[in-house]
């Protein structure tokens, strides 16, 4: 921006305004070169330690918590289109990280792609519900969207099973298991975490899972430090993809901004 301003003899603020207007009119698209982030020393170390295919590390120097969050979700939004291809069935979890990524995505078009909502609906005070995440992402990618039209959790095992047995719900559950790629984040196990505020888990539920070694939450289900599902009072009452179906996928795309998610992620 500085170089452009000096060359044209205008202020940097004017350059920023011109660029913003050009992006809104879809005259230009600004991207970051992925190699600059996947060859970062920390990215290389993460790949070596955890056996990852690639890691995209966004620097956080000089950024406060909100800025760090925004940098990571914007960086993930820039990289995501390069990871997708025609014919993909992209399974999508829910949460602020996923929703903000979708909001930051440039509108594009990928042929024959389907975005799958992996977790049922919930009563959350936030805007990033499961259906909002999948719908917004599909809109940005120009993809088909398959929403899961059922509650994420029911009051009883019997009611949950009855809903799963309904033909229309059964079809949707069968469809979401056709995913070949997964976009997700890891939730924390704090009392003010999203799984609590969304009404999926009670304090009694949280205590149960924490006592059994819970380290984080994936797709609304508690997992231990190795990413393994923990049995408890919620599993049979939930409607969504089973965690075992997420193991061994061709690609899992984890978006993890913020130091508060470090323990759950590692």
Identify the residue ranges that each predicted region occupies.
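Conserved phosphate- and dinucleotide-binding cores of soluble alpha/beta proteins
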Residues: 2-9, 14-20, 26-32, 122-266
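Short glycine- and Lys/Arg-enriched binding-loop motifs that mark or flank ligand-binding interfaces
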Residues: 22, 87, 91, 223
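N-terminal active-site beta-alpha-beta segment that forms phosphate/nucleotide-binding
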Residues: 2, 7-8, 17, 31-157, ...
């Amino acid at each position: 921006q500085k170089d452009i301003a000096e060359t044209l003899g205008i202020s940097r603020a004017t350059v920023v305004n011109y660029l913003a207007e050009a992006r809104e009119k879809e005259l230009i698209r600004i991207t970051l070169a992925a190699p600059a982030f996947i060859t970062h020393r920390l990215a290389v170390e993460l790949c070596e330690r955890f056996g990852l295919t690639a890691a995209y590390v966004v620097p956080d120097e000089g950024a406060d918590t909100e800025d760090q969050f925004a940098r990571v979700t914007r960086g993930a939004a820039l990289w995501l289109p390069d990871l997708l291809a025609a014919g993909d069935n992209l399974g999508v979890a829910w949460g602020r990280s996923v929703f903000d990524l979708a909001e930051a995505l440039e509108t594009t078009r990928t042929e024959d792609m389907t975005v799958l909502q992996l977790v049922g609906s919930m009563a959350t005070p936030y805007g990033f519900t499961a259906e909002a995440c999948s719908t917004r992402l599909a809109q940005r990618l120009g993809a088909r969207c398959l929403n899961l039209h059922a509650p994420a959790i029911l009051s009883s095992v019997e009611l949950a099973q009855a809903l799963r047995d309904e033909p229309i719900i059964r079809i949707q559950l069968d469809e979401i298991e056709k995913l070949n790629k997964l976009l997700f984040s890891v939730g924390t196990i704090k009392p003010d975490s999203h799984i609590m505020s969304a009404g999926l888990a009670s304090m009694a539920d949280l205590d149960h899972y924490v006592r059994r070694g819970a380290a984080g939450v994936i797709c609304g289900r508690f997992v231990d430090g190795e990413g393994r599902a923990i049995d408890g009072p919620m599993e049979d009452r939930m409607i969504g993809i089973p965690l075992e179906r997420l193991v061994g996928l061709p690609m899992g795309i984890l978006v993890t901004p913020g130091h508060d998610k470090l323990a759950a992620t590692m």
